[in-house]
Structures are given as C-alpha cells and as structure tokens.
A protein has these predicted regions:
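His/Asp/Glu-rich mid-to-C-terminal helical/loop segments that flank catalytic regions of hydrolases
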Residues: 280, 344-361, 393-394, 441-450, ...
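A short beta-alpha structural unit
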Residues: 139-143, 374, 385, 420-435, ...
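Active-site metal-coordination/substrate-binding segment of hydrolases
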Residues: 187-285, 307, 311-313, 320-323, ...
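Active-site-adjacent substrate-binding region
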Residues: 346-369, 526-569
Length: 610
C-alpha cells in the first residue's frame, strides 16, 4: 500500500466520527403565488441552438483570439516564417539534442508499456483514467475539502507526503509548502527547476446540491473524455497541478534536474499565499507554473489585479406592506479574467436593472439583495426581496417583470441562453411588517449598482482580442447596516489598473460609500528574450509536431508576484484543457491531461541537459 493510500485510509477512518448525519437540507417553502414569467418570452429559446464550445487547434485563427504569437508580442515578426528546424541555434533539427531527449523518453514509455505484467487488472471508471498516478493523486486530494481559507488539511497531507518520502520540505505559517527532490541519476549537475501550483479551489455549487464544500468531499464523475464533479466545481483549477507535481515527485523513473515543487494557498482569493511566501531559499531560476487551462499554449505574461470592496451603509426601519421575491438564475458565469470578453450576463447587474424598472410601478424598499459567491467569478444568480409600501398595481408589476425577462432573453440569447427570471408574492396579497432599508437608501443602492462599471474597459492595442483593462462585479451581499459589493479590477498596465481604482473611488464618493482595496498584485510582464521559453516551445513542437502558441492572458497568475521575489526568475505557464472553471460546469479533459503530463516529463528531461 502506497503512502497516499495509507494516509487517506487513516484520514477516512478518523473522520467517520466527525460526520453529521443530520445535514441541513433546503428549507421547505410555503406555496406562494408566482408571477408566471415562464409563460413569457423569458423562456423562449433561440431559434438556432448555440453549439457547445469546441477545442480549436492551436494553429487556427481562433487561437490568436486567446492571445498573441511570440513574434507579435515582442515586435520581432519576420516577413517569412522560419522553418521549425531552425528554432535551435547551431546544429540542424535532426541533430539537435532536444530531439534525442524526446525520442529517448518516448522509447522508455513504449518499453514500459510492452513489459508484460504478472497479473492484469481491468480498471473502469475513475480508476481507469490515465496517467494512473496523476489521477490517483487527483482523486485523493479531491476527497480532502480544500476551498480557499480551508487548506490546512491538504497542507498537512503534503507535509506528511514529504516526510514519508524523505524529501526536504518547508511549510510556512500560511500553509504554503515547498518540497524538494534530488535530481535523477546522472543529472546532479543540472540547474534546478521549480514547479508551481496552488492548493485551494473555488467552491461553487448548484442550488440543488446540499453539499457543504468546506467540510464534505466533492463527487467526481467521468465519461472517459472529461472529468467533472456532481453539481459543484471540480477543482481542476488547480488540483491537476498538485496531482502532477506529486506524481513527478513519486516517480523514480523520470529524468529530471533537482526539483522544487511550490504549493501555495489562497490563490483564488487574492494570491495571498504567494504574497506571504518566503522564496529566499529557492535555488531555481526557472519556474513552470501549472495553472493554465489550454493545451498547446505557453503563457508568458498576465494581467495584474486588485479586489475592490465598496460598502453602502443604510438604516433599516419597520415597514408595512406586501413582499415581492425576485430571482434571476441560469446564467453561465465563468472566470472573470478569462470570460470577461465573452459578453456574458452578470446576475447582480441584471437584478439592479429590474429593480430600477420597478421603481416606476410603485414605492418599495429593499429587504435584501444578494448575488454571486466569488469576487473573481461572473455571478450566475442573484435574488432580492423587496416590500411595496405605497400604491402599486400587481398587473403592472407582472407586466414589467415579463417584459424585462423578454428583453434580456434577447440580449443574451447567444452567451446565456438559459437565463430565467422569476417573481412571486409569498404572502398572497396580505400585508405584514418587515424590517427594510428606507426608501432613500434603497434608491441609492440601486443607483450605485446601475452606475458601477462592468466588463472590458479597454482592449490591448498590441494583442488581438485580449482585454487590457476590465472590471467585474462579483458579489453583492446584504448586511445588517447596508450592502457590500466585491469586484475585481484587472489590467496588464499598472497605471490603468490604478485609473480604474480611482474611477471607482469617485463613484463611491458620489454615493457616500466607503471603499477598501485588497489583494493587489502586479502584472507579470513579458520577458522579450527567454531561452527557457524557447526551449519549452521547441520541446513541444518536437514532441507533437505542432508549434505552440506563446501568449499573454487577462487572468491573474502567481508568476508576477513570485518573479518579483526572485531576481532573474524566468517563468512560463502551461496546463491541460479545462473549461468553465469557477462554475459547477467545470470540466477537465482527460486525454489532454495525459499529453500535458508527457510533455512536462520530456521538458524536465530537456532541462536536465540545458
């Protein structure tokens, strides 16, 4: 029995007594009179079904939309594309050492596959996924709840792993872990290389799933092509990086230089682990970040960002009237860095729009307004509870909601075809007393949300279709004395990031709101000439026959922060294909994971010679 199997068996047996059989499920609702919005055009599906996202070959024009080629990024594009074999200086491609390394590693893989096993076991389902070691580790870390701010257990798991393998390691007070492995035989003189990924995940779930993701393990499922979770985020971002690093540390057959595997905490909530990580003892000056989500893409730069928290205070008073409950859901959401240029709907802003329309149909006050769960994710659903205190017409309100639902169904028929708007009167015409914000404060809150910038602010003039600056409202939540809005500012230009922070400050001042800026991190700037990046691109081309796309991205990575801590640190970021990260629709491509892992092993072998 391997270390991880023993560790997890002990953990499961010790946690049996901690299970709570009386997990709280959703409260039963009293039947309520519902405005039949579903009978309106809000539920009308587009005449032409929108096809699912497809994986696009790296050499197509769509790939350029994700980023920009290396030549365009540094302004060195030539009129005639150089042959692939000319990537390596000096010897022709057929004599290049990289080609020898690729062939040698692949030959070892084939030899291992041809060795007859003493006893053949037929594996199915999750157990049959390849690479077996990578997905074995992925299953085990997925069984350990590890949402942001709840990573102590997985940090302990990594620490125990290092101890059992007699690897030197460091675990700091935040929970960051660095595990060092010696070079393989014959590679002791090679320069060390660092691998890096984060151990926290975004915890999002469908409303129908009662799971407590802080305490309960997610349920993995697969169709053989994709790995998903049952109505929750998968944690492929960045669990696949953790699994690959553990598999590499545990594999004595690979050829590699000395490895330093850096596991950071709380990346998803402002790169907090990377902020606090002491890298003074790091020997590596080359780092492979494993937090990218497109196979065949080598990321060389990313935007910087900051979390902005705006608070609007308000006084609650006792109000007598009839309550209307409104809900908007069915949106696609997504990572606010990667999907902000897709034009997807923001549930918080849609709800603010509807409340603004309803102001002309009667006087009401806000009891509650809540939407979104993560500052770095586009909100998929939002809900509000309001109380009408003056004269109003139910029929006019019904018509307003239905018309609004019809309007947004048309607006977002391509990006969010499943938007649903519902509104109901829970008290069925009876008035009652409730504590709500005053009319003036309610109007101020709605207008602040309406005035708040959102989406792509400016596109890059250098990199086609890549946002340069953006702002995404992620969370709106009601407190006892006001509402709180969490947003994410991103920009590849630090001065423009500051401009957006100043712009938000001006809006907040006009609405008498306070502002707090947290989790600021710098942009990871492009290194124009990188031998390490060139080697990574060359190895990929030799291995696959496809030239990789070297790009910049609008999402945030830890590379910028880490590179600032280690002078001369040259970083790249790679990863397998993942889709819909930060949403319950998140999925990880299994064949892509296998290819990426093979590429990583060959690249490490090449680094042993470089």
């Amino acid at each position: 029995m391997s270390f991880v199997e023993k560790w997890w068996k002990m953990r499961k047996s010790s946690s049996v007594t901690e299970e709570n059989p009386e997990a709280e499920g959703p409260a039963a609702e009293t039947p309520a009179e519902e405005i039949p919005v579903e009978e309106t055009a809000a539920e009308v599906t587009p005449a032409e079904e929108v096809p699912a996202e497809e994986t696009v070959p790296a050499e197509t024009a769509e790939d350029a939309a994700k980023g920009i080629s290396l030549e365009e990024a540094v302004g060195e594009a030539s009129e005639e594309e150089a042959p692939a074999q000319d990537i390596v200086d000096g010897a022709p491609a057929e004599e290049a050492p990289v080609q020898d390394i690729v062939e040698e590693v692949l030959a070892e893989e084939v030899s291992a596959e041809e060795t007859p096993a003493e006893e053949e076991t037929v594996l199915t389902g999750l157990d049959a996924l390849e690479p077996a070691d990578v997905f074995r580790y992925f299953r085990e870390i997925s069984a350990i709840p590890h949402g942001s701010f709840h990573t102590t257990a997985i940090s302990s798991y990594l620490e125990d792993f290092a101890k059992s393998h007699d690897f030197s390691y460091i675990r700091d007070e935040l929970g960051n872990v660095i595990i060092s492995r010696p070079a393989s035989a014959g590679c002791e003189g090679a320069a060390p290389i660092a691998l890096q990924g984060h151990i926290d995940m975004v915890c999002e779930k469908e409303a129908s799933n009662p799971i407590d993701m802080e305490k309960e393990a997610i349920t993995l499922q697969t169709d053989g092509e994709w790995l998903t979770a049952d109505r929750t985020t998968l944690g492929g971002d960045d669990g696949i990086a953790v699994a690959m690093m553990l598999a590499l540390l545990d594999d004595d057959s690979i050829t590699c230089p000395p490895l330093e595997c850096v596991f950071t905490v709380d990346e998803e909530v402002g790169l907090l682990g990377a902020y606090g990580l002491d890298l003074s003892s790091l020997k590596s000056r080359r780092m492979i970040n494993l937090d990218s989500e497109d196979e065949g893409v080598i990321t060389a730069s990313c935007a910087g960002g900051a979390e902005v928290i705006c608070t609007l205070s308000g006084k609650r008073r006792e109000k007598n009237g009839e309550i209307l409950e409104i809900r908007i859901d069915g949106l696609r959401g997504g990572h606010s860095g990667e999907k902000i240029n897709c034009g997807r709907a923001n549930a918080d802003l849609l709800l603010a729009r509807l409340l603004y329309r309803l102001e002309g149909k009667g006087k009401f006050c806000i009891i509650g307004f809540n939407g979104g769960n993560r500052d770095n994710a586009i909100p998929r659903e939002a809900r509000a509870e309001i109380i009408f205190t003056g004269k109003y017409s139910r029929s006019e309100i019904k018509e307003t909601v239905a018309t609004f639902a019809e309007d947004i169904a048309k607006e977002y028929s391509v990006t969010d075809p499943d938007i649903h708007v519902s509104a109901k009167w829970p008290n069925k015409g009876r008035k009652s007393l409730h504590i709500a914000f005053g009319r003036k404060d309610s109007r101020r809150m709605i207008r602040f949300l309406m005035a708040f910038p959102n989406g792509v602010i400016e596109y890059s003039p250098l990199y086609r279709d890549v946002p340069q600056t953006s702002l995404s409202m992620g969370i709106v939540k009601t407190m006892a004395d006001g509402i709180c809005i969490h947003s994410m500012v991103r920009s590849s230009i630090n001065s423009q990031k500051q401009m957006m922070l100043d712009r938000i400050a001006c809006i907040a001042e006009e609405f008498d709101a306070s502002i707090d800026i947290k989790g600021t991190y710098p942009a990871w700037e492009l290194i124009e000439k990188s031998d390490f990046r060139d080697l990574a691109a060359e190895v990929y081309q030799k291995l696959t026959g496809i030239e990789p796309v070297v790009c910049v991205i609008h999402g945030g990575l830890e590379c910028g922060l880490l590179a600032a801590k280690v002078p001369g640190l040259d970083c790249i970021s790679i990863g397998p294909d993942m889709e819909e990260v930060h949403t319950p629709a998140e999925r990880l491509n299994i064949p892509s994971s296998k290819r990426t892992y093979e590429y990583l092993k060959v690249l490490l072998a090449a680094c042993s010679e470089a």
